[in-house]
């Protein structure tokens, strides 16, 4: 809905290989959510480790930069850090930190260390074994990283192309948008791990196997 953000998304999807007609459709979907967004007028900025009414603030970057969970008496208010039946989207966006998937995997480690007895998430039912769910999500991303490596070869692929290899052909624009972002976060994690290479071809970012 924000014109400046929409322009950044257009440039972002073009940078990662989406054709212009597809880019317009992908970005157009973002305006759908605008009526549902309400911003806090005077936000209180807080950091991990601080207390808010007796709740400990726990860093949980990955799904969103700067995301914080609340922990008290074994109860974790988990926002979208942990979900019971689906996996939170962990994507690379124009304003993202450089390694959102690495951030997310580290946050899942932290969840296991804290070992809360229950987690209340932003979607779905309460999670009665948060540490176990964190391990399941780590395994999901380990397998997705393996898929990403297997999908890469000597021929350069864009994030847009990679999203078809990882998520298939039959996606609506809103799902394709997230699929591209997720493909990029996994590709960048592999680049940082030395298992893939990032290149550029005519102003478009590409990835190959290392």
PLM features: residue spans?
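Residue-level detector of conserved, well-ordered beta-strand and adjacent loop positions
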Residues: 47, 61, 208
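Alpha-helix boundary/capping residues
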Residues: 16, 111, 166-169
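Metallo-beta-lactamase
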Residues: 22-43, 56-145
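A structural signal for short hydrophobic beta-strand segments in well-ordered beta-sheet cores
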Residues: 52, 70, 196-198
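Extended, charge-rich helix/loop segments that form flexible
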Residues: 2-32, 36
């Amino acid at each position: 809905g924000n014109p400046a953000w929409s322009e950044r998304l257009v440039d972002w999807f073009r940078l990662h290989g989406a054709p212009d007609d597809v880019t317009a459709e992908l970005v157009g979907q973002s305006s759908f959510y605008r009526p549902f967004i309400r911003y806090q007028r005077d936000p209180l900025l807080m950091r991990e480790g601080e207390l808010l009414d007796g709740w400990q603030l726990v860093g949980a970057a990955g799904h969103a930069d700067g995301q914080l969970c609340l922990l008290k008496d074994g109860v974790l208010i988990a926002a979208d850090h942990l979900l019971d039946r689906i996996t939170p989207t962990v994507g690379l966006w124009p304003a993202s930190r450089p390694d959102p998937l690495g951030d997310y995997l580290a946050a899942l480690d932290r969840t296991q260390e804290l070992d809360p007895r229950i987690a209340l998430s932003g979607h779905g039912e309460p999670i009665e074994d948060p540490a176990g769910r964190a391990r399941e999500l780590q395994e999901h991303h380990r397998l997705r990283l393996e898929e990403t490596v297997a999908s890469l070869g000597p021929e350069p692929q864009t994030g847009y192309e990679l999203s078809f290899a990882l998520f298939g052909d039959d996606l609506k624009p809103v799902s394709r948008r997230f699929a591209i972002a997720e493909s990029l976060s996994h590709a960048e994690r592999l680049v940082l791990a030395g298992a893939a290479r990032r290149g550029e071809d005519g102003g478009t970012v590409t990835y190959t196997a290392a």
